[in-house]
Amino acid sequence: MTNAVLNEKNHSVTSEETKKERVRILAPRVDIYSDEENIYLLADLPGVEEKDVQVQLEKDQLIISGKTSNKDIQGELRYSEFRTGEYKRTFTLTESVEEDRISAVYKNGVLNLTLPKRKPLTKKIEVRSE
């Protein structure tokens, strides 16, 4: 009886998987560099349209994502080396950034992010004698 339940569950899972289109997750290639004022990130997202690029900042997590497909192809696809699917990559920021000043420019399949570093707050503490 136990085997029948397991087989049925496995069959259901297998059936559901075959119904869904498999989505391929791709990690975009990046270059990251910085200077005293900014962190710069360049992400290669070939084939992704600007409207499909997303950049999110959640606490110290920077998330880059986008989608590409080969929907516009006419005729029967015989051979393909183009990468299609979803791009997604998450980075943990090791420095504080000014969220309101982050800029993102997308041109020729390359996402260029500029993340201004937050200036360290220094507070002078008064020392008293007792």
Curated annotation (Swiss-Prot):
Keywords: Stress response. Residues 21-130 form the sHSP domain. CDD domains: ACD_sHsps-like. Gene3D superfamilies: 2.60.40.790. Pfam families: HSP20 (PF00011). It comes from the Bacteria. Belongs to the small heat shock protein (HSP20) family. This is Probable 15 kDa heat shock protein. It comes from Leptospira interrogans serogroup Icterohaemorrhagiae serovar Lai (strain 56601). The lineage of its organism: Bacteria, Pseudomonadati, Spirochaetota, Spirochaetia, Leptospirales.
